């Protein structure tokens, strides 16, 4: 094992301070925490920091809706976020806020450095302005059609379908999400970061080989499309940091948010002696810096952030570790189905170690979505952790306690088997290092099977009946406990609570290095239950609780929108129609026979539908919302059956499938209750 201690700084993306943590957030934080805990076990000097992203118009407007100041809102949300992360054993060394003195100082220092180096430009721009609310509209408060791929209902800064970035004025048919009004153009002087000046540096960074291949490929696409100067300013009213020497200009939240990584670390340096800020962030730093993020914010972290750091003469990250989204039972998390589960709700019903283990068992180093299949969740946790792992300890501990007063044997019964377990240490370590947690879990569980096979073949319950085999009984049961100890050591980064209980039982502390040292002639503590079975009834209760909580949240949001009329995600109701108008639309239940992605399109899925007496081919722009189209096969949808066929580039579309949502990844197919049949008319 390596004896050279590495200096490492790890961050997670900053949760936005206007809403709760959910199980989608937890994927990233669990992934990072496992990696951090592994590095600590290896003896490396590692710091793990995060913060709340606490600026921007959404926070300003939500605070206004609630009748509180933004500072009060973000303080309350931060306490809830920290409680959720603590509940899931996320071992941050520091959790801070972007609305802090450290962040303000760093933001202004980096801005001044970029200005001195000639990377900040100013020019007057035409900006969208809400005539009803008398305010300039931030990017995320304008929606319209993407100018690149023509996907509808996209935000004003980037497209969730094709990942393109653009100016809000480039949107086709824009509308204000604050009032629903059509915005008008109004001039304003803005500040820009000269991103194109860093093209050569970013190209070299892509080719370094350190980035995930999917990230490098996507960056290459963005380069080919051309880098644009980045607007880093926003007009008042805005909740954030004011740009120095201006009256009503503020830093865009995406400028100060990643600097929040630095601010949280600087705050830690002020609280804990012996940590040097510059040794981690200076241009000459030899420390390692890694960001764990979701694929939805890849653009900002892979282009703007390294360019900002380079322009301010600071070091760049060694790597950006990008993960996919969480789905539940093969579908997007749904508030109506109760699968949009808040972290706090989960903690009321289930052990956080169960989710940590399940996520780890399915996580790899690629940017693949992870499906939380609830049936598989129960089976895997109960089989692996209860039936195999914990049972290995319990079936041997009782003999050691009753017959030998808790004393382990003074030699190994099967040294070859023990050596085989230790020999896997570096392979498992390599899997952890490279974030191939699923592969690590598979290796560990394969060893668990071998350990149980050893106990089954030795049959200590048979040996115990023969008084002449007392020494053999002690050695066999001690061997079983030794193998359990090694396995728990390997799983400690994933299951810190279980590991702590096991350490108390084993009367020892587990490090990666001492896993190889057997506990010979060692006193252990009386065995206590280490882990409880996962109960599907508890999951069902959690789902029902989530439905109720989400419904209440929607009612509160709806009431606030009506009372304050400050902000609404929903489109205004269209003009009234007559019943005769509605009856012209023939809505039918359709069964999905086949569904596949259209390779040449960024947003289309191709459906073959059974509508009772015939089949139809329909193209639907929901690709971003349903990443595994084959999973839709066999389910029922609602379609407009009498819509005139439309000839498209990829074939004839013979109808329209109905879905709800804001567009892009935020779309949900309409369901029908059990019993409905293909071809039935919707009335």
Swiss-Prot record:
tRNA-binding domain span: 581-683
Cofactor: Zn(2+)
EC code: 6.1.1.10
UniProt short sequence motif 'KMSKS' region, positions renumbered to this chain: 332-336
Reactions this protein catalyses: tRNA(Met) + L-methionine + ATP = L-methionyl-tRNA(Met) + AMP + diphosphate
GO biological process: methionyl-tRNA aminoacylation
Residues binding Zn(2+): 146, 149, 159, 162
Annotated GO CC locations: cytosol
Comment on bound cofactor: Binds 1 zinc ion per subunit.
Chief location of this protein within or outside the cell: cytoplasm
Subcellular location: Cytoplasm
Gene3D superfamilies, per the entry: HUPs, Isoleucyl-tRNA Synthetase, Domain 1, Methionyl-tRNA synthetase, Zn-domain, Nucleic acid-binding proteins
NCBIfam families in alphabetical order: metG, metG_C_term, PRK00133.1
The protein, known as: Methionine--tRNA ligase
Name of the gene encoding the protein in the UniProt record: metG
């Amino acid at each position: 094992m390596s004896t050279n201690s590495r200096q490492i700084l790890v961050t997670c993306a900053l949760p936005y301070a206007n809403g709760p943590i959910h199980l989608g957030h937890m994927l990233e934080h669990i992934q990072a925490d496992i990696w951090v805990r592994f590095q600590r076990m290896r003896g490396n000097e590692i710091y793990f920091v995060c913060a709340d992203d606490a600026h921007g118009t959404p926070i300003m407007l939500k605070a206004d809706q609630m009748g509180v100041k933004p500072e009060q809102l973000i303080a309350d949300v931060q306490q809830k976020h920290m409680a959720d992360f603590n509940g899931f054993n996320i071992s941050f060394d520091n959790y801070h806020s972007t609305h802090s003195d450290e962040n303000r100082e760093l933001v202004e220092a980096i801005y001044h450095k970029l200005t001195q180096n000639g990377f900040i430009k100013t020019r007057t721009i035409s900006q969208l302005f809400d005539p009803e609310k008398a305010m300039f509209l931030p990017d995320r408060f304008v929606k319209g059609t993407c100018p690149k791929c023509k996907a509808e209902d996209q935000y004003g800064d980037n497209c969730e379908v094709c990942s393109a970035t653009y100016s809000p004025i480039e949107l086709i048919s824009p509308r204000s999400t604050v009032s629903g009004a059509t915005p008008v153009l109004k001039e304003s002087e803005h500040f820009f970061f000269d991103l194109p000046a860093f093209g050569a540096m970013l190209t070299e960074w892509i080719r370094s080989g350190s980035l995930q291949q999917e990230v490098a490929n996507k960056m290459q696409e963005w380069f080919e499309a051309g880098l644009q100067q980045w607007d880093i300013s926003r007009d008042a009213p805005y909740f954030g940091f004011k740009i120095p020497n201006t009256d009503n200009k503020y830093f865009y939240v995406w400028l100060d948010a990643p600097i929040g990584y630095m601010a949280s670390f600087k705050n830690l340096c002020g609280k804990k002696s012996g940590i040097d800020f510059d040794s981690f962030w200076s241009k000459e730093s030899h420390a390692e810096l890694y960001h764990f993020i979701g694929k939805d914010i890849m653009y900002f972290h892979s282009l703007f952030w390294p360019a900002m750091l380079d322009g301010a003469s600071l070091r760049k990250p060694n790597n950006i570790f990008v993960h996919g989204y969480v789905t539940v039972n093969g579908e997007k998390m749904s508030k109506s189905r109760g699968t949009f589960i808040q972290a706090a709700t989960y903690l009321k019903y289930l052990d956080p170690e169960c989710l940590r283990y399940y996520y780890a068992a399915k996580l790899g180093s690629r940017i693949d979505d992870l499906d939380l299949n609830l049936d598989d969740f129960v089976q895997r946790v109960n089989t692996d952790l209860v039936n195999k792992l914990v049972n290995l300890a319990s079936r041997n501990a009782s003999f050691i306690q009753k017959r030998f007063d808790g004393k382990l044997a003074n030699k190994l019964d099967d040294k070859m088997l023990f050596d085989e377990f230790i020999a896997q240490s570096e392979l498992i370590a390599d899997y952890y290092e490279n974030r191939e947690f699923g592969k690590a879990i598979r290796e560990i569980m394969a060893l668990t099977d071998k350990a149980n096979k050893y106990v089954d073949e030795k049959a200590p319950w048979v040996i115990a009946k023969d008084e002449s085999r007392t020494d053999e009984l002690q050695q066999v049961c001690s061997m079983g406990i030794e193998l359990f100890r090694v396995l728990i050591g390997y799983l400690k980064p994933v299951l810190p609570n279980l590991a702590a209980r096991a350490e108390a039982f084993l009367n020892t502390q587990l490090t990666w290095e001492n896993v190889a040292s057997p506990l010979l002639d060692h006193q252990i503590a009386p065995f206590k239950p280490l882990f409880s079975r996962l109960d599907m009834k508890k999951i069902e209760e959690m789902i029902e609780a989530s439905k109720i909580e989400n419904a209440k949240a929607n009612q509160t949001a709806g009431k606030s929108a009506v009372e304050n009329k400050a902000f609404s995600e929903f489109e205004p109701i269209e003009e009234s129609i007559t019943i005769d108008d509605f009856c012209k639309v023939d809505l039918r239940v359709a069964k999905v026979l086949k569904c596949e992605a259209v390779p040449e399109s960024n947003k289309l899925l191709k459906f073959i539908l059974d509508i009772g007496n015939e089949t139809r081919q329909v193209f639907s722009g929901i690709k971003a919302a349903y990443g595994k189209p084959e999973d839709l096969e066999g389910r029922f949808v609602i379609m407009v059956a009498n819509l005139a066929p439309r000839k498209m580039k990829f074939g004839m579309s013979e109808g329209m499938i109905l879905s709800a949502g804001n567009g892009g990844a935020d779309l949900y197919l309409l369901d029908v209750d059990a019993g409905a049949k293909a071809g039935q008319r919707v009335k």
